[in-house]
Amino acid sequence: MHNILEEFAIISPNSEEIDVGEPEDIALQNAVLKARDCAKEGDIIIACDTLVACDGKIYGKPYTIESAIDMIKKLSGKWHSVFSGVCVKTPDKEVTFVEESKVKFNDLNEEQIIDYVKKYLPLDKAGSYGIQDGVVVEKYLGDFDNIVGLPVKKLRDVLKEISYVK
């Protein structure tokens, strides 16, 4: 965010996330819920929700080490999609978009998966991994920052459109 905005604050929303529907719709609806939950008079809010989809299943953040291991097992050796829904809420409008990137995991054995989870503790990451760790991902297509969790290039374009950044 520092490469887009000079000043910002991070606020944790209290909104309850939805988890039923198409992955791009879920990510977008959750971003809108987060933005509305955090909105205060006169503020500009940028909210994002990122999730992973593979073989018809949606993977958010794991709640336990065991669920992180299970998620990575299911993604191992496969292509999957990373969807980030973004809502930019200004005092007079909401601008929303969804960014999709594709990721191919390395084919990992159980020992590699357990070692990864123990070393990186990815409990705060959709799909139980961080591409920036450089361990589990074989290749990707699309915006690297989107896979990290915020599609910075598209966000910058939206902020320019609404005359919030130069």
Describe the residue ranges of each PLM region.
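A short beta-strand-loop structural module common to alpha/beta enzyme folds
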Residues: 7-19
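N-terminal beta1-alpha1 ligand-phosphate binding loop
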Residues: 1-5
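Anionic-ligand binding patches
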Residues: 22-166
